[in-house]
Amino acid sequence: MLLCIFLPLSAAANGETQAAGEEIFTLSFVGDLTLGTDPHISGGPNSFPSMIGTDYGYPLQNVAEYFLEDDLTLGNFEGVLRSGGYITKENGFSFKGDPAYTAILTQGGVDVVSLANNHSRDYGQRGLENTYSLLEEAGVPGILQNEYRVVETESGLKVGVLALLFQAKPKTVAAAVEAMRREGAELIVALIHWGVERSYHPSRTQEQLGKALIDAGVHIVCGSHPHVLQKIEQYGDGVIYYSLANFCFGGNRYPSDMDTAIIQQQVIRRADGTVSLGERTIIPACVSSQTPMNDFQPTPYPEGSESYNRVLTKLEGGFSGNPKQQSYPW
């Protein structure tokens, strides 16, 4: 029997040996997908709409190979897709994109997204409902706060995906896990919006809640909201990605921290039908293919570069630098 194998974060390895009767699946996780921008800058020459135009393959073209070849890709969809509408927030940024931007996800290989975040209602309840419907029509489930979806990959793995905010209650999550299992879910994933913006280290509340979610039956907890990377922590039979930062982020043309990552997690299904987590591959990346201006095209860093190693340090929980003092390879 092959037990759970967790490699050091510095190892981006493949080729795990399979025991007889085992199947191995690969799930990819990314951070914030903000396919649009604030209306105050939407008409600028370097804004997301201006850069993308109708080339919907452009934003994810440097990373699509990872997503199109895996079994399932998941992320946090932060913003609204709709034509027109009125901003309902009095302060802060409001993110909106063209309804046609669902093609960015489908062409780029993104399969499931969470809509549980602080920008899903930037244009009110109607904006959220419109976004949900557009994603459904495109075949990309958008999961609402405290709701779940059991999705089956083309390769036959049934994954229960739960969308949460920081107020999540472990008892409620445990009940949702049981419901997903009754619907056939073999693996349970929680996509949760939590933490402190621009903090490289999870709060005590995050750590306590993340572990409670694993105790409640979740295999993988994937966090968003801080906009920067935070550590990965193995806990029991599960794993917590505290924050995967921005990924394809149309909300900021000049982000102070451009580091991001793709996490590819292997899942092992044994002959008796039980599943466990296998090898984990880290793909350190930048939110842009150039600097200092964000061109909204996430791009892997050259292996072994200063930026590549900095991402690994952040995911190991050892980073304490200033985002404005970081260097990039382009």
Residue ranges and their predicted role:
Residues 14-330:
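Acidic, metal/ion-coordinating pockets
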Residues 1-14:
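Sec-dependent N-terminal signal peptides of Gram-positive bacterial secreted proteins and lipoproteins
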